[in-house]
Amino acid sequence: MENSRRDMMAGACAATAMTFAPAALAAWEPSQRYPDPAVQSLDPSFNKYRLALAGVERLATGCRFNEGAVYFGDARCLLWSDIPNNRIMRWDEETGRISIFRQPSNHANGITRDRQGRLITCEHSGRRLTRTEYDGAITVLIDRFEGKRLNGTNDVVVTRSAGS
């Protein structure tokens, strides 16, 4: 039997995965030293913002591409987007428990809070910017500009309006 290029590539990928998988799946342990030597600044000008006694903690596994984290101090939880898995995740600060806040999320990306504390979400597949009301209802804030659908809403920041 003759091996095809596809067979060779599949074998190479499998060998690579077997080589690096143990390191990727190894138990993660937080640093016992401060400042955490695993946290490195690529730009020295950032060092003035680094907290010497702050470390890195793993909150969750099973996510594929996380983005848009926003902290809700009043609810003591952290929300973030897991874009490829089409969900918004929630970490409860009091229990340490991870749960799904919303799925599907329309491939939510950037998220933040408005000045009233509601969740504002950029939705890739919805091609829109939405607000989650206190009762859980979703309000579309914008999905078109000059009559055309938005394309790839990404990150969002809420600022004060003029005069407020």
Question: What is the role of each PLM region?
Answer:
Residues 2-3, 9-13, 25-164:
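Sequence-structural signature of mature extracellular/luminal beta-sheet repeat domains
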